[in-house]
Design a protein with these regions (language model features):
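Alpha-helical linker/edge segments of TPR/alpha-solenoid repeat scaffolds
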Residues: 51-60, 383-394
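Conserved alpha-helical positions within TPR/SEL1-like repeat arrays
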Residues: 59-70, 86, 95-110, 119, ...
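TPR-repeat structural position
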Residues: 5-8, 21, 41, 74, ...
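Extended alpha-helical scaffolding segments used for macromolecular assembly and cargo binding
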Residues: 1-71, 79-80, 87-90, 96
């Protein structure tokens, strides 16, 4: 913590103790702008909660919602955003209302509720256009593109990303331009055009390095690593993941560090080095638990289960998958729950327990329908296949 931030923290403590809400709110906002980008989520939540003891404050609700969302607690986050929205609307702060709608949309997106996410983004967009927030408009267009990308509509995703790219270039938002180029690269990666993906990632890297956006550079390096991973160039993938990891550690982003370690573990799985993969996953798990990210914890436990399954240790695989399920349900991640139940079904199928595999797949298909998952058709086909296999007998 820098000396300046330490002084602000002490001023905030004294303002709360002295019942001086205006000072507490102003200082809390300043400190949150420093802490949120470096994953100091628990500290942001504590400070915002202290400020709120002095009365309702939209900014504190917003900051606390962000912190709670980032640490895997989507429902408390959504309640904070709801409170912030009420106050911003009462104050006529249309720009902040739009920002809050956009953040709430991101939470719903993380929960797998793509339609509700899209609804929030589409409500934010006209507000941003009304107040002339071109940079915010670009971010929201990017978010809308992200929904369409996940829904399996890459061309609609690209259309929104290109609109966002035009705006970021028009307003001179170099960091935003880099983010959008990265997102465009990811669409190309998803449709298998990996060389075009790498071209966009390299453009983004050039910009992030030019503007000194270390966090953005790390994100793009991670994406470059993922592209090389899909190309089968695992050594180059690991090299880029390690470059990202070095930056992430330098900026103190603990959640990002866990994500990078998780990515490295995934590459080791592809290389068949399963014990090294497990070492990376366990390092990531310790960090993600430290920062309190329940959704991230579930994702890493899921990968640990997958690694044990690859090792042929079905009992340990099932143990870890079953650790994942209550967390997925706790955070409301129905899409993630479907993924884990699918993994459980495959373990049971490999072990010859078709009855249990079918029961899990029935739940998978039901969850797929609830969230509009693009894997519904494939999962339904597998369920039919297993039912037919059971009917035919050994």
């Amino acid at each position: 913590m820098t000396a300046t931030v330490a002084r602000w923290v002490e001023v905030h403590r004294l303002a709360v103790a002295g019942r001086q809400p205006e000072i507490a709110r102003d200082v809390g906002d300043r400190v949150s702008r420093v802490w949120l980008p470096t994953s100091r989520f628990a500290a942001v939540e504590a400070m915002a909660t202290a400020t709120l003891t002095l009365g309702p404050d939209a900014g504190s609700f917003y900051d606390r919602g962000w912190a709670r969302s980032a640490t895997g607690r989507p429902w408390p986050a959504l309640e904070d955003y709801r409170q912030a929205l009420i106050l911003y609307r009462q104050a006529g702060q249309r720009g902040n209302e739009a920002a809050t709608l956009s953040q709430a949309g991101r939470v719903y997106f993380g929960l797998g509720d793509r339609q509700r996410a899209l609804d929030h983004y589409q409500r934010a967009l006209p507000l941003q256009r009304e107040v002339g927030d071109r940079a915010g408009e670009a971010v929201t267009l990017t978010n809308i593109g992200g929904v369409h990308s996940v829904l399996g509509d890459p061309y609609r995703a690209l259309d929104h990303y290109q609109q966002a790219l035009t705006i970021t270039r028009a307003v001179g938002d170099r960091a935003g331009e880099a983010t959008t180029l990265t997102d465009i690269g990811t669409v190309y990666s998803n449709v298998g055009d990996l060389q075009r993906a790498l071209d966009h990632y390299q453009q983004a890297l050039t910009i992030t390095r030019a503007v000194g956006n270390r966090a953005g550079e790390a994100t793009t390096l991670n994406n470059v690593g993922a592209a090389y991973h899909r190309l089968g160039d695992q050594r180059r993938a690991i090299d880029h993941y390690h470059q990202a990891l070095t930056i992430i550690r330098a900026v103190g982003n603990r959640a990002g560090e866990a994500a990078a370690l998780n990515n490295i573990g995934d590459v080791y799985i592809g290389l068949g080095e399963l014990q090294r993969a497990l070492d990376q996953f366990h390092q990531a798990l310790a960090i993600i638990r430290e920062v309190g990210d329940r959704a991230g914890e579930a994702a890493i436990l899921n990968n640990i289960g997958a690694a044990y399954n690859r090792l042929g240790d079905r009992q340990r695989a099932l143990h870890h998958f079953h650790l994942v399920l209550p967390i997925r349900r706790e955070v409301g991640d129905r899409a993630g729950e479907a993924t884990t139940r699918y993994n459980i079904a495959l373990v049971h199928r490999a072990g010859g327990d078709l009855d249990q595999a079918i029961r899990e797949l029935e739940r998978v298909v039901d969850l797929d329908r609830q969230v509009g998952h693009p894997g519904l058709e494939a999962d339904t086909a597998l369920l039919r296949q297993l039912r037919q296999q059971r009917a035919e007998g050994p």
